[in-house]
Regions:
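Polytopic membrane enzymes that build or remodel cell-surface glycoconjugates and lipids
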Residues: 2-480
Length: 480
């Protein structure tokens, strides 16, 4: 039998700990999930008062307007290649109709499941349940972008993918401990389902490679190998970006969207996860090299993975908020969009690993727990105050979307399609194949009035016999 991973060999005051058994485990899990639910309800109280973004209405409407799941797959799978999310969304539309609270509850439940699987995976990486629970607490209170809960389509993509992302890690950990074809099949199946939710899940393959090569055949951590792989992956991703942006003929934007995530979106999560395990207590973990590499990896994340308009802001955010152990996302929720949902879990894992290593180095376990408690409380308070403050700025247009929903739903007639114009110049490769089939209504395609790309479009509809006009401007449909 191959040796256990190095993270499972860690022992001592701040190392491994046996998991709680029986009723205690259920009690701890229940208390933790209840606390997380209470926090989400408090922190996102302002967002819950609004409806969905216009894109979410688009996907919701398609699922509501058509009885056959086959239509959902055949119609917009061409531009939105995530069949597992289609299936989730179609089922959710049937179960939840258009009631926002039901989607919020489903999103919170999916997020809680992600945290639970994350804790299970972190137990082997961090060498014990207490530190894994600490990492889960940080992820639960600090790294839940409001978009992930608020956007019923885009958020579901991240949440559903996250479930199978962490499941793949767990199955692979078990496969390493006891190899066998059955366990390998579980790894492959979970990876396939993660890919069916989001194509960037293929970046789990570098995770498995880094995991294997970092520990080596004897199961001992080899951090220099990990740093070499990090440098190689970074160089490979930069080379791919250069190719897609400057060399690839044709449609570089489409290529970047489809291929870029395969190479880089989540490998930073993978690498940071491995590095957390590559530095167990007593191995000289807290070194300038580790902290420098940590910062460099996240600088690369902001430079190469975030939208262009946010890159400069992201680098400034790193420089300004660099503080001991809590230099991320404290006052700036918008700096962590849904695209960094999985990397955020890797960051939470790195925090727990650093606190664990610090406590071991100083031989003061309580200090690590105290710092962890301060970090969790500070991040929870900061987000709980900041998110409602951001809501009027970011979500106010969403309130006007509710007017459009009310108008369209008043005209909802099963079997009679309502065509809603979507600005094809924004992302023609994604939206042109489907051209936005919306709800089930009483209008014909001639009732759609396209305008310029800057102004978007106008939709003429009827509410109880009265004409009403919806305009698409700055990303939102508004009633006029």
């Amino acid at each position: 039998m191959p040796p256990a991973p190095a993270s499972d060999q860690v022992s001592g005051a701040v190392g491994a700990a046996r998991p709680p058994s029986g009723g205690r485990a259920v009690l701890f899990a229940g208390v933790g999930l209840a606390a997380l639910a209470a926090y989400l309800a408090w922190a996102y109280r302002a967002a819950f008062a609004h409806f969905f973004f216009d894109d979410e209405l688009l996907y919701l409407a398609r699922a509501l307007a058509h009885r056959s799941p086959a239509y959902v797959f055949t119609t917009f799978v061409q531009g939105f290649p995530r069949p597992l999310v289609h299936l989730y969304f179609f089922a959710a539309a049937r179960l939840f109709d258009a009631v926002p609270a039901r989607y919020y509850a489903a999103g919170a439940a999916l997020f809680a499941a992600n945290v639970a699987l994350f804790v299970a995976a972190a137990r082997r990486i961090l060498g014990g349940w207490p530190w894994a629970a600490a990492a889960g607490a940080v992820a639960g209170v600090a790294f839940f972008p409001y978009e992930t809960l608020y956007n019923v389509a885009a958020g579901a993509t991240e949440l559903v993918c996250g479930l199978f992302f962490f499941a793949t890690v767990i199955f692979y950990q078990r496969y390493r401990e006891r190899p066998g074809p059955g366990r390998l099949a579980l790894v492959a199946g979970a990876l396939a389902l993660a890919y069916a939710a989001k194509e960037s899940a293929l970046s789990l393959l570098p995770l498995l490679v880094v995991y294997e090569l970092t520990f080596g055949e004897k199961g001992k951590p080899q951090p220099w190998r990990a740093w070499g792989l990090l440098a190689a992956l970074t160089a490979a991703y930069v080379a791919l970006e250069v190719y897609l942006q400057f060399i690839l003929p044709g449609a570089p934007n489409r290529g970047r969207y489809m291929l870029g995530p395969l190479a880089g979106l989540n490998w930073i999560t993978a690498t940071l996860t491995i590095l957390a395990a590559a530095f167990p207590p007593g191995a000289g973990a807290l070194t300038p090299l580790k902290l420098l590499g940590w910062l460099a990896a996240w600088a690369a994340a902001f430079v190469f993975l975030k939208p262009r308009r946010e890159r400069g802001f992201g680098l400034a955010w790193i420089a300004v908020t660099l503080a001991p152990f809590i230099f991320w996302q404290v006052p700036i929720v918008e700096a962590m969009p849904r695209y960094l949902f999985l990397p955020a879990f890797g960051f939470a894992l790195m925090l727990a690993a650093t606190l664990r290593d610090l406590a071991a180095k100083l031989r003061r376990p309580r200090l690590g727990w105290a710092l962890g408690a301060v970090a969790v409380a500070g991040l929870a308070l900061a987000n709980g105050v900041r998110i409602p403050a951001l809501a009027p700025r970011f979500l106010a247009p969403g309130a006007r979307v509710r007017d459009g929903v009310r108008i369209i739903r008043a005209n909802l007639v099963p079997g009679r399609p309502l065509y809603l114009y979507r600005d094809e110049l924004l992302e023609p490769w994604q939206y042109a194949p489907v051209n936005a089939v919306f709800f089930g209504g009483a209008l014909a395609p001639t009732d759609v009035l396209p305008e310029t790309a800057a102004d978007g479009a106008r939709l003429l509809t009827r509410e109880r016999g009265r004409l009403a006009l919806l305009s698409y401007r700055q990303g939102f449909w508004r009633a006029e």
